Amino acid sequence: MILACDVGLKRIGIAVLLNGVILPLEAILRHNRNQASRDLNDLLREKNIQVLVVGKPNESYADTNARIEHFIKLLDFKGEIVFINEDRSSIEAYENLGHLGKKNKRLAIKDGRLDSLSACGILERYCQQVLKNR
């Protein structure tokens, strides 16, 4: 199974590829990086993940890239790790919330649904860029 994550300072959005369908999962709320890495490790084991797709912004965001790489190194994951450009994934996910009212959009941001929708976009890019070439 393949899992994608959108690593942020407060939340980690999660999506999985299940039988060819991309599904958002409940986001991991970060209290600190050790707790968040434990929670992600548990999920990777529980779902028997073989490939972890991680969204990273372009090189001009050096601090963010370093933070994401450091976080991923905290994981005890033996499968394949693939980094995919995540530029605009959060913006695209937010645009997909157009059907929600203002209050529900704010709630979707706060509870991590937006982050998991962003992870769906990252996983979709992985499928388009990597899986179609296999």
Curated annotation (Swiss-Prot):
It is found in: Cytoplasm. Keywords: Cytoplasm, Hydrolase, Nuclease, Ribosome biogenesis. SUPFAM superfamilies: Ribonuclease H-like. InterPro entries: RNaseH-like_sf (IPR012337), YqgF (IPR005227), YqgF/RNaseH-like_dom (IPR006641), YqgF/RNaseH-like_dom_sf (IPR037027). It comes from the Bacteria. GO terms for biological process: rRNA 5'-end processing. Its EC number is 3.1.-.-. GO terms for cellular component: cytosol. The keyword Glycoprotein does not apply. Belongs to the YqgF nuclease family. This is Putative pre-16S rRNA nuclease.
